[in-house]
Regions:
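Glycoside hydrolase catalytic-domain context in secreted enzymes
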Residues: 1-216
Length: 216
């Protein structure tokens, strides 16, 4: 039995009662749906109609859409969800990771070039403030990969650079700020990627680094 009052949940008695009551009232299909996070590319009503007729997902991810559409999407999702949903976006550079009108603060490598963790905090603040304004509560960020090839098309400027210590400091500052703002941070890593100069979405890329330097 999971102790919901203990780490990492720390729920109050009334919160635990809500969890138990809600869980008891869910069908097997609804419970299974909580395991899914569905990508909505355009956040249009017909997308939600199609998905929610198949399952009731516990999480949804938005691509970049206009602000009004993102707000309408959140309202649509909440109206269909028995459990408050997780709503995520790639909040790597600013609020522009979720809405077209969002603020582009700077790519992580630009932020790292300042060598000022205060800038990472400001970028994270913009991400969290603008995403939460349209209902998002989950950041698919920060990326904590280490840049090992400036020609790599996947990570490169999406990272906080080639210095592991700077990556750690910047990534930590981002996580602390978005969590303080009430969003969940999901540290992102692309295992084995970063060495090749080709896009692994299009071809099978190659990691030619030996095991020892890769692990260290």
């Amino acid at each position: 039995m999971i102790d919901l009052a203990a780490k990492p949940f720390y729920l109050k008695p009334e919160d635990i009662e809500w969890v138990n009551t809600t869980l008891a009232g869910m069908t097997t299909e609804e419970k299974a749906g909580q395991l899914f996070c569905v990508l909505f590319k355009e956040c249009k009503p017909e997308e939600f109609e199609y998905v929610f007729n198949i399952l009731k997902p516990g999480g949804c991810m938005y691509r970049v859409v206009p602000t009004e559409r993102a707000i309408a999407a959140t309202q649509n999702i909440y109206s269909r969800s028995k459990v408050p949903p997780l709503i995520a976006a790639n909040l790597e550079k600013g609020g522009n990771g979720i809405v077209t009108e969002g603020t582009l603060v700077g790519a992580p490598m630009e932020i790292a070039a300042t060598d000022d963790i205060g800038m990472a905090t400001k970028m994270a603040h913009a991400c969290a403030a603008e995403a939460s304004a349209v209902g998002a509560n989950w950041a698919f960020a920060p990326i904590i990969d280490i840049d090992t090839n400036y020609r790599n098309p996947i990570t490169n400027t999406r990272t906080f650079g080639s210095d592991p210590e700077r990556v750690r400091r910047m990534g930590r500052a981002y996580v602390e700020e978005v969590q303080k703002m009430g969003l969940a941070a999901s540290i992102k890593h692309f295992p084995g990627d970063g060495q090749d100069e080709r896009d692994q979405h299009l071809v099978t890329s190659i990691n030619n680094m030996d095991c020892d330097p890769w692990m260290n």
